[in-house]
Design a protein with these regions (language model features):
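Glycine/aspartate-rich loop-and-adjacent alpha/beta segment that forms the canonical ThDP
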Residues: 1-7, 14-18, 29, 50, ...
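Conserved thiamine diphosphate
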Residues: 3, 123-159
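Thiamine diphosphate
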Residues: 43-112
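Short acidic, glycine/serine/threonine-rich loops at helix termini
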Residues: 44-47, 119-123, 180-184
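Glycine-rich beta-alpha junction loops
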Residues: 37-40, 113-115, 172-178
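Active-site-proximal loop->helix
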Residues: 93-101, 118-135
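General beta-strand structural signal in soluble alpha/beta enzymes
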Residues: 33-37, 55-58, 81, 145-148, ...
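Active-site diphosphate/adenylate-binding microenvironment
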Residues: 2-60
Length: 207
């Protein structure tokens, strides 16, 4: 991983799977997690599969827009968007919308390894010039932070939903592969998630 110059010189390179396990350990039972494509949702599936998890399949850049929709539709539910840096670069417009409407129940976690990992490790703009925390702050998400280390991540996650607006955390991570493979069944994923949010009906898919 090649890291750009960012306004956080003490940031450590962390492991995505470990951070995901720490995130899952902090979840309350009713919180929804929308995970972006590839290793981001593979690690979430491995760390703790639950009906409130939504795993993206091929829709790069849509974790934040979907999480925003859930947060606005169910304002009493905590919602977390778990996204990679390459995917968030495809959805920068969504950050401006989040910065404008400021849903206090939304947390965004960006795993930044500076590459498009599952397509061949091509270099992303985050490895050269783009600072996603600075971009988020510029978009109006004032409570945006680089994660310094694993303990700092847990501390920041513990105070999510306590402030008056959304929280965005970005972590520099290594390029280790995913720790599991999410079942690629869109209907099953959708139905379980709807059931987890209390909006779906009982189905044969709820195995």
């Amino acid at each position: 991983m090649t890291a750009p110059t960012i306004d956080a010189p003490d940031v450590q390179v962390l492991n995505r799977a470990d951070l995901t396990r720490r995130l899952v350990a902090k979840l309350k039972c009713d919180e929804a997690v929308v995970a972006g494509i590839g290793n981001t949702n593979f690690d979430l599936y491995a760390a703790g599969h639950r009906p409130q998890n939504f795993y993206m399949l091929g829709s790069m850049g849509l974790a934040c827009p979907i999480a925003l929709g859930v947060a606005l539709a169910q304002p009493e539910r905590g919602v977390i968007a778990l996204e990679g840096d390459g995917s968030i670069l495809m959805a920068l417009g969504c950050l401006t919308t989040i910065g404008m409407v400021k849903p206090r129940n939304l947390t965004i976690v960006i795993m930044d390894n500076g590459i498009y990992q599952i397509t061949g490790k091509q270099k992303a703009a985050t490895a050269v010039t783009a600072d996603v925390v600075a971009i988020a702050r510029g978009a109006g998400i004032a409570d945006s932070h680089w994660v310094r280390d694993a303990t700092h991540f847990e501390t920041l996650m513990s105070r999510r939903f306590d402030e008056g607006g959304p929280l965005l955390l970005a972590a520099k991570i290594d390029d280790q592969g995913g720790t599991a493979q999410t079942p690629r069944d869109p209907a099953l994923i959708r139905q379980r998630f709807m059931r987890g949010l209390g909006t779906g009906r009982q189905s044969a898919l709820d195995a």
